[in-house]
Amino acid sequence: MSRIGNRVITVPSNVSVNQTKELLTVKGPLGQLDLKLKEGSKIKVNVENNEIRLTRGDELKQTKMLHGTYNALIKNALEGVTVGFKKELRLVGVGYRASLKDNVLNLQLGYSHPINLDIPKDLKVTVDKNTEITVSGIDKQKVGEFAIQIRKWRMPEPYKGKGVLYLNEQIIRKAGKTAEGKK
């Protein structure tokens, strides 16, 4: 039994939640998010008295999985439109730099060419000190996906600790090869 799905979600006073057939619209001070519910799912969403309750119509494995997932997605949407989400990255390495021009993030990560990433329209990206990047927005999934898209260009490596790291991330360092030659 999904315990996460049975939790009651309280809606903040400055957020409005509207439900149509298979679409849940969450509006708040930071924006609006639309959650598409799977067609034919037996999950019922009840919005009343600033509370959201999810109930499932049957005990099939698929329905049980969606029960907890929908609860988490709705909770993330409520948090996103009130507080927002952000991921902070830092560039560690000689010559690693980032800059913003118009709606393009320019990264120099030791390759022979710069990397230009188009910033999605619903995300906000800021660059501080040329080595710190902050990705923020109301959709938790999109913020995380764009942060990973930046990070995949130079994943942190364990020998020198260089790469694109999340803020406060610690890389477990490995010892390099030791000279084994003459005895």
Curated annotation (Swiss-Prot):
GO terms for molecular function: rRNA binding; structural constituent of ribosome. It comes from the Bacteria. One of its GO terms (biological process) is cytoplasmic translation. Keywords: Ribonucleoprotein, Ribosomal protein, RNA-binding, rRNA-binding. InterPro entries: Ribosomal_uL6-like, Ribosomal_uL6-like_a/b-dom_sf, Ribosomal_uL6_a/b-dom, Ribosomal_uL6_bac-type, Ribosomal_uL6_CS. SUPFAM superfamilies: Ribosomal protein L6. GO terms for cellular component: cytosolic large ribosomal subunit. NCBIfam families: L6_bact. PANTHER family: 60S/50S RIBOSOMAL PROTEIN L6/L9, LARGE RIBOSOMAL SUBUNIT PROTEIN UL6M. Belongs to the universal ribosomal protein uL6 family. Part of the 50S ribosomal subunit. This protein binds to the 23S rRNA, and is important in its secondary structure. It is located near the subunit interface in the base of the L7/L12 stalk, and near the tRNA binding site of the peptidyltransferase center. This is Large ribosomal subunit protein uL6. It comes from Mycoplasmoides gallisepticum (strain R(low / passage 15 / clone 2)).
